[in-house]
Structures are given as structure tokens and as C-alpha cells.
């Protein structure tokens, strides 16, 4: 019913069913994992009005599992990528796997999928830093970087009358920086990946 993928490793489709509505994937050597993809295999859909809450568990210093809600998969959104590199320390959140005796070794983490009502899932809040960067966040970063550069560069602006002649320094007119800034913004709005070509 479910699959799990870690970059550089084989796809896992052998989720251990630990309860009627709960499934677990083991992630050995989890310390080297940055992102995890969880997906439906397409063979068995969720029952109507149901979906899967996706949890990440890692062992704390005492070996006890710490569970964190990453997000959700549904028939309408059958796959998701989660960033787990920043979640390997700290405290967990409420989860449905607490009363189960799931064996866990110090270097093995787990991905848990709990089949739940969509209404119940909508009331849960995944950990904020598990979401993977999107084009929107990249565009937002680029915009902030452009603004910062433009503000920094123009903070040194002086008029021609204020310039002290120095043959070893090169000056760039501020209107050239502004033109570049506006051109870059326009190109980013048209295609956020234009810089790759």
C-alpha cells in the first residue's frame, strides 16, 4: 500500500503493519538521511474520507523513540517529500504509536503511517521545518537577496560632486544597479529557474 524512498537507497515497499491502521518503515543509519519520500503504491487507495498521517521517529539518548508528525498523504496527494535532517534532536509531538512495542535500535529511525479520518488529520499540525523548500520559498529567498544587495549597494551612493578622484577605484552608476535589479526581478517572475541556463 505504501512506499518509502531515501536518496541513494533502494525503494522500500515492505512496511511492517503494526496495527490494523498503522504501518512502519525502518530507516537504518538514519543519521545520514536528509530527506524522505513517502508515497502510495497505487495498488490500494485509502478508504473514502481517509488519509495517512506520516510520522518520523528517531531514538533519543536513552533509546526511546521520539515521534514527530511530518505531514500527510491522501488519495488526492499520494506522495510527499519530507526534510528530516533538522528533526534528529529535540522533543516529539503527540502520535498514535506510543502504546505499541516497536523495537528500535540506536542507529535505526522509523517512518510511521497512521490511517486516519481526513477531518482528524486536518486538526493536526505537522512540524514546521519538515516541509521541503518549494519554488515559492526559493523565489522569496532570491527576492530578499536582491533587496538586500540593492539596499547595500545604494547605501554607498554618492553624487559626482562628492566623489574623490581615485584612479585605482572603479565606480558603477546606481542606475545600472537599479536596471540590473529590475531586470533580474522580471526574469525571476517569468521563470524562477532562468539562472540554470
Curated annotation (Swiss-Prot):
The source's domain of life comes to Eukaryota
The Swiss-Prot or TrEMBL record annotates one GO molecular function as: Hsp70 protein binding
The cellular component terms of Gene Ontology attached to this UniProt record, alphabetical and capped at eight, are: cytosol; nucleus
Spell out the subcellular localization from the entry.
Cytoplasm, Cytosol; Nucleus
Q: Which UniProt keywords apply?
A: Cytoplasm, Nucleus, Protein transport, Transport
Record Pfam families: Hikeshi-like_C, Hikeshi-like_N
Listed under GO biological process in this entry are: cellular response to heat; protein import into nucleus; protein transport
Matching InterPro entries, A to Z?
Hikeshi-like_C (IPR048364), Hikeshi-like_N (IPR008493), OPI10 (IPR031318)
What's the stated role of this polypeptide? Acts as a specific nuclear import carrier for hsp70 proteins following heat-shock stress: acts by mediating the nucleoporin-dependent translocation of ATP-bound hsp70 proteins into the nucleus. hsp70 proteins import is required to protect cells from heat shock damages.
Q: Which family does it belong to?
A: Belongs to the OPI10 family.
Specify the protein name: Protein Hikeshi
Instruction: State the organism named in the record.
Output: Xenopus laevis (African clawed frog)
Q: Which gene encodes it?
A: hikeshi
